[in-house]
Amino acid sequence: MRAKWRKKRTRRLKRKRRKVRARSK
């Protein structure tokens, strides 16, 4: 389920990559 959510929001992740990385952990 997480992998699919990342692929669907892959474009937004690229913009907030720093915040996303901290949230992922």
UniProtKB/Swiss-Prot annotation:
Keyword Signal: no
Gene Ontology terms for molecular function: structural constituent of ribosome
Tagged with keyword Acetylation: no
Pfam families according to UniProt: Ribosomal_L41
Keywords recorded for this protein, A-Z: Cytoplasm, Ribonucleoprotein, Ribosomal protein
One annotated GO biological process: cytoplasmic translation
Cellular component GO terms held in the UniProt record: cytosol; cytosolic large ribosomal subunit
UniProt-listed InterPro entries: Ribosomal_eS32
Superkingdom of the source species: Eukaryota
Sequence segments annotated as region (Disordered): 1-25
Location in the cell: Cytoplasm
Known function: Component of the ribosome, a large ribonucleoprotein complex responsible for the synthesis of proteins in the cell. The small ribosomal subunit (SSU) binds messenger RNAs (mRNAs) and translates the encoded message by selecting cognate aminoacyl-transfer RNA (tRNA) molecules. The large subunit (LSU) contains the ribosomal catalytic site termed the peptidyl transferase center (PTC), which catalyzes the formation of peptide bonds, thereby polymerizing the amino acids delivered by tRNAs into a polypeptide chain.
Quaternary context: Component of the small ribosomal subunit (SSU). Mature yeast ribosomes consist of a small (40S) and a large (60S) subunit. The 40S small subunit contains 1 molecule of ribosomal RNA (18S rRNA) and 33 different proteins (encoded by 57 genes). The large 60S subunit contains 3 rRNA molecules (25S, 5.8S and 5S rRNA) and 46 different proteins (encoded by 81 genes).
Family, per entry: Belongs to the eukaryotic ribosomal protein eS32 family.
Note: Present with 11900 molecules/cell in log phase SD medium. There are 2 genes for this protein in yeast.
Name of the protein in its database record: Small ribosomal subunit protein eS32A
